[in-house]
From Swiss-Prot:
The organism of origin for this protein: Clostridium kluyveri (strain ATCC 8527 / DSM 555 / NBRC 12016 / NCIMB 10680 / K1)
Gene3D superfamilies cross-referenced by the UniProt entry: Alanine racemase, Lyase, Ornithine Decarboxylase, Chain A, domain 1
CDD domains assigned: PLPDE_III_AR
Class of enzymatic activity (EC top level): isomerase
Protein name: Alanine racemase
Single GO cellular component term: cytosol
Record: residues binding substrate: 136, 315
Pathway(s) of this molecule: Amino-acid biosynthesis; D-alanine biosynthesis; D-alanine from L-alanine: step 1/1
Amino acid sequence: MFQKYRPVWEEINLDNLVYNIGQIKSKIGNKELIGVIKADAYGHGAVEIAKVLLENGVSRLAVAILDEAIELRKNKIKVPIMVLGIIPHAFLDEIMNYDIEPIVPSYSYASKLSKLAESKDKKIKVHIALDTGMGRIGFSIDPNSVEEIGKISKLPNIEIQSLFSHFSTADETDKAYSCEQFKKYKLLYEELVKKNVKINMRTISNSAAIMELPDTYCDLVRPGIIMYGYYPSTEVDKNNLSIKPIMTLKANVVYVKVLESGSYIGYGRKFKCNRKSVIATLPLGYADGYTRRLFGKAKVIINGKFAPVVGNICMDQCMVDVTDVGEVNIGDEVVLIGEKDGLKFNADDIAEITGTISYEVLCMIGRRVPKLYIKGGEVVKIKNYVISSDS
């Protein structure tokens, strides 16, 4: 039982994380690896995950927003940090102050960065985003973009660290569109080379491309979901990469009661007991990322058996029918996401029954759920965001 304030927690298996990184490194050979740890490392805790990545061959990190980069810097993470989203002009000073590597979406943006860097007598490394078919951010693949990027490369105190793009369908069986994207990417890069535009690195490979498109590795690959032990989709060939989920969501039973047949459970009286039932209450709910969309579909692992979640999931609590799983007591451990006793109900399973993807399931787990980092079977770190506690 976890004794730190709240009987709900995530267990983050750092040995599995190290295993996953090792498998990725074996796959990519001598290519450089940038660990994508945006969204608090997909819900696993960015700072602690970053430390393990850097100890195991990851040389750079990528996040989505400036705040995430600053959090890493404030926790003494010193390696290059790329921000994948566009940082608003109002915060360009922070890019300099924290030595962050931003995305440059236009010449005017780069020009402002250049002037700021010049005024501080600093050099700033930037990443040029290309829109090869995602339709999100980045330069279009056309002659005007070649000219504009060429102008950026000539700005004082600016160094182009990478030319990067992102696949939109690499996790699908049909790779035709991804191949088309890569063709566009190479075409624009070759045009830049002809104009003597210096690009330090090229990067386009995401998790799915790492698994199935080795010709796209270029200089630097960007694994995300596969580091955390989940495949990008059901369409990728899992035989291409062996990985292990690193997170288990657990709770302790906080209340047990017997309800008579005909009793209702939860908001809206959506569940009615059709027999005399033993109901256990767990102290987590949709505010913790355990979504109401699981109504009538979720199950947990307790006493070596599955037990169904019944009634609408509340903000902070949910109820489980444990009538058929033997004696259940307050304090008993329950697995809500993960594996135990040969049974499995993980983020992929939740994604399937709620019509989403494992990424969202992992990222939804709220910051008020404490994280226990485990190595060699022992807890080596506890992170509780709510009370800003490390132990």
